Amino acid sequence: MTENISNEKPRLVNAGQGFSILNTVNYKGRFLYSKYSPDKAVVAAVSRLQVLPQTLVVICSPCLWYGLNELCALLPESCSIIALEADDALLELAEDSLLDQTQKLRVKLFSLNEPQKINEYLLQNTSSGNFKRAIRIDFSAGVSFS
């Protein structure tokens, strides 16, 4: 049983709430979003953010990127977004789910298994004083697998 869970791939499950076309993710025996309103919690968390100019926003476990449009809409132009994923299967899901070209230009997605790439990006962008602060936001329950 444990071996089956460790080899499991993330599975998209229709939330099935009215006319909603949103999915949730079932992975390693748990849902990473609500089964009924998958985007509700992360959109609410984003709406509560107070983001100042020159902030680096760190998205943890982006999975299906619910909340990204809302986040991009509230960010000052001087802010940047990076997304981090520790689990390889969830990283692949996040890469496949980030379809919008505008979003791809705004967000840099990194695997936590490649710290040198994260370090290079941060050194390149912090040395010129681009960021004065950072905030973290968890986009899914996938953070529990890191």
Predicted regions and their residues:
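N-terminal donor/sugar-recognition subdomains of glycan-related enzymes
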Residues: M1-S146
